[in-house]
UniProtKB/Swiss-Prot annotation:
Cysteines engaged in disulfide bonds, as pairs: none
Entry's Gene Ontology BP terms: cell division; cell wall organization; peptidoglycan biosynthetic process; regulation of cell shape
Pathway(s) where this gene product acts: Cell wall biogenesis; peptidoglycan biosynthesis
Organism the protein comes from: Haemophilus influenzae (strain ATCC 51907 / DSM 11121 / KW20 / Rd)
Domain of life: Bacteria
EC annotation from Swiss-Prot or TrEMBL: 2.4.99.28
Reactions catalysed according to its record: [GlcNAc-(1->4)-Mur2Ac(oyl-L-Ala-gamma-D-Glu-L-Lys-D-Ala-D-Ala)](n)-di-trans,octa-cis-undecaprenyl diphosphate + beta-D-GlcNAc-(1->4)-Mur2Ac(oyl-L-Ala-gamma-D-Glu-L-Lys-D-Ala-D-Ala)-di-trans,octa-cis-undecaprenyl diphosphate = [GlcNAc-(1->4)-Mur2Ac(oyl-L-Ala-gamma-D-Glu-L-Lys-D-Ala-D-Ala)](n+1)-di-trans,octa-cis-undecaprenyl diphosphate + di-trans,octa-cis-undecaprenyl diphosphate + H(+)
Function recorded in the entry: Peptidoglycan polymerase that is essential for cell wall elongation.
Record's protein name: Peptidoglycan glycosyltransferase MrdB
Family: Belongs to the SEDS family. MrdB/RodA subfamily.
Pfam families assigned: FTSW_RODA_SPOVE
Amino acid sequence: MEDKIPFWLRVWQRLHIDFWLFIGLLAITAYGMLVLYSASGASETMFNSRIIQVLLGFIVMLLMAQFPPRFYQRIAPYLYLIGFVLLILVDVIGTTSKGAQRWLDLGFIRFQPSEIVKLAVPLMVAVYLGNRPLPPKLSETFIAIAMILLPTLLVAIQPDLGTSILVSASGLFVVFLAGMSWWLILAAVIGLAGFIPIMWLYLMHDYQRTRVLTLLDPEKDPLGAGYHILQSKIAIGSGGLSGKGWMQGTQSQLEFLPEPHTDFIFAVMGEEHGMIGFLILMAIYLFIIVRGLMIAVNAQTSFGRILAGATTLIFFVYVFVNIGMVSGILPVVGVPLPLFSYGGTSYVAIMASFGLLMSIHTHKSQFMKRS
């Protein structure tokens, strides 16, 4: 029977690759590279660097897909501990960039440990809860939340409010999908609402408060705090239906738009490709998210279901936060557009998370045989 299956298909199956998810990731990466080339001002150096990032990302994804989920259950505590130690090292010997100490420079490589933590936190929480009867007990829920808060606080003091929110959200999605009590969710929401004034007065930095106030009235300081948002909205709005054309955007090409290759690359896409480009982008993202949710629903274990579901939901949050930020409906928090913005650590970390998804999906037959 196996002889009747085409050779290329047999190779594909043995590599433990989910075809549809692979196609979605390839499509969003290709579109992102097209826009990035324009956003960088046709910089061959940046484009070549992106090619290396993409190759490394796909290699990491493919490698992670080869190992069964039980392998990640075993290494999760070590990965969590490594991420935690790296965050401490950032505070001690980290490299400062744009007023924030977020990077580790080892000479041969420079990376953000917070990106590793985005993967390690939901994995560790999923292992902890997935090995216990669900829904979790109250004590187990509090232990899981403590696992989330420790690295979140270390990221927040860098300071990196946007990433700290995403790290906490990635872990909380796991707790929620594990069956967290609705009463506890309500209590958490009320507690968070009460904590906001304290955070505003004592924990947030001046520039973070300025970003929130700027969101409410960016025109108040058009050449200062409101500059980013206003230029981004001008770029998106001027794109119209079909855009101004590839590499024809005035806001990006004339350097009015800040950070066009990272946080504000969506504005470049909107200006040059218009509403049509936006719909294409959203269709690809939706395709990836739906495929991820399908993998979560069809997973054979509690660990697989809650981890795949949380990974997919946090990917959606990345997309939502970046587009909301660039469109002026959310504060600017420095969250890149996933798999689209320039940035090696972020790209590889997200591809690694999709490698986990492929592992959960393509190795599920092993669980069925054991059961």
